[in-house]
C-alpha cells in the first residue's frame, strides 16, 4: 500500500504479517508489484508514477475524494484557482492539490484566508473530514477575497453524521472517550468537538 491503509497500527501490523507492506514513496514499491492507493487518494503525478513502474494499481480512493479530484481537474481546465479548506500536510489535501495545474491554496485558519490574494474566480472545496461549521465560517471570509466563488461543501456525509452525534452525546455526558487512531483526522476532529462541550474528554 502507498502509505498505511488505515490509521490503526494494530491492523497495519497484522496486514504486514500477511505480507501486505506499506511504502512511503512510489520508489519504495518494487516495479511490477501490486500497489494499493488508499482512501485518501493520490496526486495525478503519483498515479502516473505507479503506472510507469508497471505496477498493478488497485485504486481504493474514497468516491467522495475522487469526486473532489474531478472538481480540481475541472477548475484547472476552466482556468479557475482551487482553494481547499483543510490541513495542508494531510495526504488527502496533497492529493487533491495534485489534480490541478492552476493556482492552488490550502487554508485552515483565518490567517490562511487573510493571506490569500484577491482573485476573480475560484473553486472552493473542503477536506472530507472538515467540521462543517468551520468550513462555512472560512467560506464567508473567502467570499470577500474571490469575486466569483464556486463553493462545494465536500464533507463526507458519514463524517458529518458522526460529528453531529458526537456533539449531541457530549452535551449530555459527564465524560467522553474518543477511541481512534492518533494520526486520524476524523478522530482528532471528534475529540476537538467533544472537548469544546464536555471538558472531561479523553
Functional labels for PLM-detected ranges:
Residues 1-202:
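The feature marks the mature, well-folded catalytic cores of soluble enzymes
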